[in-house]
């Protein structure tokens, strides 16, 4: 424990959200419009700031709920960067289908609870059915309408989401996005 006092350095907290205030629909001329990111942030890291919103990177826990419900794309989940998530999704589904796989069901799970549950199923049971493809993400709540529709476009028959009990308070935005995708 005394060795800790000699440790010197920096800690860099990741910035989970990229925010483009130019396309934010929060407010204009003092008239409030969209508040979806504020309403769905479980940590309170997003606050109104005039005609835009302010993201506090030190409070943000990186759940991605804000990005998944943002109608304009002003809030974008930054991890992984760019199109990495969609490229992984497309590659996995194309490979499965090209190998003769049928009726792919995508199981979206986080890297903590989800991976542990899938491992437990493999150790203590028969594992996942052959047509259920696990897809690991940083936080399940980061997926939104764009991801759900892309999964269907890339060949997924269904998208299943494994959400840990500790995240049950963060599911409202995700459920709204899933209902919208189902309607489309």
Segment roles from a protein language model:
Residues 106-141:
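Mobile, glycine- and charge-enriched loop segments
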Residues 25-26, 48, 62, 77-78, ...:
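Flexible loop/turn segments at secondary-structure boundaries
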Residues 147-184:
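Cofactor-cradling patches in redox/metallo enzymes
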Residues 32-56, 61, 65-83:
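Iron-sulfur cluster-binding cysteine motifs and their immediate structural context
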């Amino acid at each position: 424990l005394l060795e800790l006092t000699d440790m010197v350095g920096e800690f860099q907290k990741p910035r989970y959200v990229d925010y483009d205030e130019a396309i934010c629909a929060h407010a204009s001329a003092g008239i409030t419009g969209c508040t979806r990111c504020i309403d769905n942030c479980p940590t309170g890291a997003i606050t109104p700031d005039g005609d835009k919103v302010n993201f506090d990177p030190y409070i943000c826990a990186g759940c991605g709920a804000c990005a998944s419900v943002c109608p304009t794309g002003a809030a974008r989940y930054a991890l992984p960067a760019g199109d990495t998530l969609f490229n992984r999704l497309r590659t996995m589904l194309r490979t499965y289908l090209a190998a003769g796989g049928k009726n792919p069901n995508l199981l979206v799970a986080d890297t903590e609870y989800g991976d542990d549950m899938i491992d437990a199923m493999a150790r203590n049971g028969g594992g996942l059915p052959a047509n259920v493809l696990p897809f690991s993400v940083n936080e399940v709540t980061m997926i939104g309408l764009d991801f759900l529709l892309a999964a269907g476009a890339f060949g997924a028959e269904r998208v299943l989401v494994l959400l840990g009990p500790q995240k049950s308070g963060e599911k409202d935005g995700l459920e709204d996005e899933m209902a919208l995708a189902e309607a489309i």
